[in-house]
């Protein structure tokens, strides 16, 4: 039984993720942990799933503390005082989705082995219910948000920037506006009232969904625009000219400030731009599978200084292995207080990228990847942890099966002549598809 993806358990509410499933997750977890803290994002279905989880946890004898509506990084930080953390969220997915994400006390999401143990236990109904006198107690933590804010304020300096903040009607509304105000910023808020219908925009903070933020930054003469997804584990930005800042650019900028003169290791997924390698020259760039869980695991294994994903997940291991969009927002404000974001972007090398896809039946993907690898290997150094990435003298190409569609995706990036690299890769892929 496969329940967990790269972002925990996630699916359409009452179809793929049901109260019955949540009850079983709670029973399995409660049979193995004595204490847990649970939180939820604003989506309409979250209280229902939370109640089912709490019922399962306490029925198995686990004491549960409810943190209420909080961001995922707030919940992951609160987990340090318990044996595990449980977050009800579907992150950047639309309203009809709901999910369950599980956290260790160090802020690391449950790893593959822990996930498989839960899946197997649910399938075999390997859990226990305690007698009435051993049922777990339920308490509330009213200080989870304050504790998270205090931790960040102890690490980040103050500034007087004017910031437009778009929380996307998500859980970030409960913390980021107040944190940035306490750090001295003048805050102009957009969509910063929690609403699980996400009426203002799609929760994913990408260029397409942030048109209002881009206009507002210019209209208000702001120094910076910041946006979150539904649970604020992600953070994206707009510069003072109203331009969306790409994830690769933010990854590089944060990396420069985190590494400083230490030139340590930085962990990124396989589809990250060469910009990061070149801008962070002297630092070791380690690549993992796509997914913030895998980036976090890589950071922990390599004792890296920093890591992140261009999708907007920034991981600072000095505070947690959970992507923390709240800390990232405060840190970016501190950085931009010293130098305009547009000026920081101007320092970055920009390379051309080209993407495409070709049809490939799902049942043929495994065999296709074998053939593609044999044809791509002569071109350069191959990294095959997530698709096939080939390092070329002037760039790289990544061939990766889609996880959601009957397609294989091709991505090419080059310091020059990206069309030539892409066409070469496309020709090889077409041959491997025959």
Curated annotation (Swiss-Prot):
GO BP: any one term: carbohydrate metabolic process
Keywords for this protein: Isomerase, Magnesium, Metal-binding, Phosphoprotein
Cofactor(s) this protein cannot do without: Mg(2+)
EC number from the UniProt entry: 5.4.2.10
One Pfam family it belongs to: PGM_PMM_III
Xref: PROSITE patterns: PGM_PMM
Residues modified to Phosphoserine: 91
UniProt GO molecular function: magnesium ion binding; phosphoglucosamine mutase activity
Active site, UniProt feature: 91 (phosphoserine intermediate)
PTM summary: Activated by phosphorylation.
Binding site for Mg(2+): 91, 229, 231, 233
Cofactor detail note: Binds 1 Mg(2+) ion per subunit.
UniProt catalytic activity: alpha-D-glucosamine 1-phosphate = D-glucosamine 6-phosphate
Family: Belongs to the phosphohexose mutase family.
Function statement: Catalyzes the conversion of glucosamine-6-phosphate to glucosamine-1-phosphate.
Database matches in PANTHER family: PHOSPHOMANNOMUTASE (PTHR43771:SF1)
HAMAP family noted in UniProt: GlmM_A
Protein name as annotated: Probable phosphoglucosamine mutase
């Amino acid at each position: 039984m496969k329940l967990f993806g790269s972002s925990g358990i996630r699916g359409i509410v009452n179809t793929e993720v049901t109260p019955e499933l949540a009850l079983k997750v709670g029973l399995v977890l409660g049979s193995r942990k004595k204490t847990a803290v649970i939180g939820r994002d604003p989506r309409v279905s979250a209280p229902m799933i939370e109640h089912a989880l709490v019922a399962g946890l306490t029925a198995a004898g686990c004491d549960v503390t409810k943190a209420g509506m909080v961001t995922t990084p707030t919940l992951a930080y609160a987990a340090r005082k318990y044996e595990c953390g449980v977050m009800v969220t579907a992150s950047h997915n639309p309203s009809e989705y709901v999910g369950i994400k599980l956290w260790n006390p160090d802020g690391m999401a449950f790893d593959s082995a822990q996930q498989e143990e839960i899946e197997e236990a649910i399938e075999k109904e390997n859990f226990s219910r305690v007698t009435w006198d051993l049922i777990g107690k339920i308490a509330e933590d009213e200080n989870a948000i304050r504790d998270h804010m205090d931790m960040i304020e102890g690490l980040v300096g103050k500034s007087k920037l004017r910031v437009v903040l778009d929380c996307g009607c998500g859980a970030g509304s409960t913390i980021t506006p107040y944190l940035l105000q306490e750090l001295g910023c003048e805050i102009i808020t957009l969509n910063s009232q929690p609403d699980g219908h996400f009426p203002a925009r799609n929760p994913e903070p990408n260029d397409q969904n942030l048109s209002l933020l881009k206009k507002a930054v210019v209209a208000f003469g702001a120094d910076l625009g910041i946006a979150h997804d539904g649970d604020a584990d992600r953070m994206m930005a707009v510069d003072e000219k109203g331009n969306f800042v790409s994830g690769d650019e933010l990854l590089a900028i944060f990396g420069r400030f985190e590494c400083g003169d230490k030139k340590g290791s930085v962990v990124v997924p396989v589809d990250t731009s060469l910009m990061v390698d070149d801008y962070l020259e002297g630092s070791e760039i380690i690549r993992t599978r796509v997914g913030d869980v895998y980036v976090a695991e890589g950071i922990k294994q390599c004792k890296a200084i920093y890591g992140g994903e261009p999708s907007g997940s920034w991981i600072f291991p000095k505070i947690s292995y959970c992507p923390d969009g709240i800390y990232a927002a405060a840190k970016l404000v501190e950085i931009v207080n010293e130098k305009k974001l547009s000026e920081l972007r101007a320092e970055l090398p920009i390379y051309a990228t080209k993407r495409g896809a070709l049809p490939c039946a799902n049942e043929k993907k495994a065999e296709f990847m074998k053939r593609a690898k044999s044809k791509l290997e002569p071109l350069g150094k191959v990294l095959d942890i997530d698709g096939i990435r080939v390092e070329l003298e002037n760039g790289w190409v990544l061939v990766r099966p889609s996880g959601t569609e009957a397609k294989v995706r091709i991505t090419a990036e080059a310091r020059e002549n990206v069309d030539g690299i892409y066409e070469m890769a496309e020709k090889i892929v077409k041959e491997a598809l025959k």
